Amino acid sequence: VRIQRLLFKVARSPIATFFIGWVFAHMSFAIPVNRLRETERLLAFYHPQPSYPLHILIVPKKAIPSVMHVTGADAGFMVDLMQTVQSLVSELQLEARGYRLIVNGGEYQDVPQLHFHLISEHDG
């Protein structure tokens, strides 16, 4: 719990842009989260501080500050993202119950690392 609090504090600090991207790119194995999926390009895990009954984060293992920085070189990540979302929606039976896939940007983005929220009002 202490490590999670420290990480959230760092995530909102001025060094976060460099630090978060570097950690996901080089140290994702050490991030203390409840993992659901992991590929060469992404990590999906339960949000440590959920805002919804089901709240999953999907984060690239590459420093990408926001959706505005995604390029053609990130096509592999985008394919992994869609396959991961489809797999989780199926596994957690969210199709019938409803879900949303959200990406925040600009002033709505708290952490300067691209990440997607897979959420549902219904527990998984």
Briefly describe each language-model feature range.
Residues 1-124:
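HIT superfamily nucleotide-processing domains
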